[in-house]
């Protein structure tokens, strides 16, 4: 019975896959978003976004209950999503959620606080 139980345990882990996304520094993130096919996504609050954001970034607040619903409506599955938050914490949560649904995600690991590029208000 023990070998069978171990086999079942092992097989259950095979079905679980961690959500994969790339976490990059600000310089690499800037290079990534130079590609005009990459979608820029700000996952902060509306008030944070209004204070300044990366140009052409969409806003979907990851703390809202309808985050995934809005993401599925606005983000095409065939595009790379480059996302960020203020410090890198919320963006990791958003990156995991999106990657789990099959999106290709690149996340700014140190957040907007480390951004030295152009800012739009």
Model-derived features with residue positions:
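Short, surface-exposed ligand- or partner-binding patches at beta-edge/loop junctions that are enriched
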Residues: 84
């Amino acid at each position: 019975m023990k070998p069978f139980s171990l086999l079942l345990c092992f097989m259950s882990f095979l079905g679980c896959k961690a959500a994969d996304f790339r976490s990059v520094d600000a310089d690499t993130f800037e290079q990534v978003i130079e590609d005009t096919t990459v979608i820029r996504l700000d996952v902060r609050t509306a008030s944070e976004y209004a204070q300044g954001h990366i140009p052409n970034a969409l806003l979907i607040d990851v703390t809202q209950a309808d985050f995934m619903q809005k993401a599925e409506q606005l983000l095409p599955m065939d595009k790379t999503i480059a996302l960020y938050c203020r410090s890198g914490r919320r963006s990791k949560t958003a990156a995991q959620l999106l990657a789990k649904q099959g999106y290709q995600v690149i996340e700014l690991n140190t957040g907007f606080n480390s951004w030295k590029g152009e800012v739009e208000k």
